[in-house]
Amino acid sequence: MGDFIGHISPGLFLVFYGLYQAVIVSRAVIFNDSLLYPSYLSKNKGKWARLWKIAHAGWLKVVIGSLLIVYEISCVKEGLTLMTKGVPPRFMYPKEWQHLTMFFLLTLDGCVEMVSKNVLRQRCVLLERGATVLGVYVLLLLLVSHVKESSGVELQVHSLLILVVFLLMLVLTAELWAPEMFHLWMIETFLILIMGSWLIQAAFILFRPVSGFPWEDDDISDIMFVTTFFCWHVMINALCMLGIYGVSSFWHRCYSPSLRPMGSKEALYQESSSGTFYKLLQEAEQQDKDDQAPLLSKISPCDRA
């Protein structure tokens, strides 16, 4: 799958997945809501309630992973075999088998998420995050061995990708102990966006250069500009996340003014409810006293005795 489609397809998936997660994280930060158990899922009681509770990200991972597996197998015209029939036997298509391993782990991650959210009686967050961490660990190992035969521009492109995957591995490992920390989720989303956009950029650098001329491995300027482009991707994705947060905040404040940050919403509701009840109780007691005052004034002292 070392072609244009093989790089741009996973890149597009990661970009759209990162944008989706950026919206989810922005909403959770704005309303101080839970990232793993958002309140809008429990409050949705309509006919679409079950649809909202479906593991959309899990289904997406399964579908994309399966399609990439089919595409990888179809790219080998002679048939994807593991070893030659000669003596001694030799392994065949090492990079293709590495790609299949990556896509299989992506599909497995989606299946685990679906089972945890929609099959098990009680959701197991540790199982979900563990499957994701396993996939990223294996991805890092495969990428390190994937660039053994690379050099020049291709080596620089994949080295920067390995750097992003390594940082993502550290963040996901930390999330095993702090699954609800907003900062870790924001960094994770940021790294996923960088990983996706850089894969798209890599597809054009390695296979379809915009200039129409291939990049030169012996030209130090080309290698330096690979790093420059990567830094631009970092800045653009940071601005993208900031823009998503700003638009989400503006939308919820202007078009949903009745909504409040979820962290203090229940407290405000209880406080207002108890305060209103206490005020009504005082008014009722005062009205009873006012009604009883004329009756007491009509009773003579003899009657009282």
UniProtKB/Swiss-Prot annotation:
Primary subcellular site in the record, as a coarse category: membrane
**Record's InterPro entries?**
DUF716 (IPR006904)
- Does the entry annotate any disulfide bonds, and if so which pairs? none
- Keyword field: Glycoprotein, Membrane, Transmembrane, Transmembrane helix
Which cell locations does it reside in?
Membrane
Glycosylated positions are 32
Chain spans, region Disordered: 285-305
Which superkingdom does the taxonomy of this entry point to? Eukaryota
**Parts of the chain that traverse the membrane:** 4-24, 54-74, 124-144, 159-179, 187-207, 223-243
Fetch the Pfam families from UniProt.
Answer: DUF716 (PF04819)
Gene Ontology CC terms: membrane
Report membrane topology: Multi-pass membrane protein
* Family membership noted in the UniProt record: Belongs to the TMEM45 family.
* Protein's UniProt name: Transmembrane epididymal protein 1A
- Tell me the organism: Mus musculus
Whichever gene encodes this chain, its name is Teddm1a
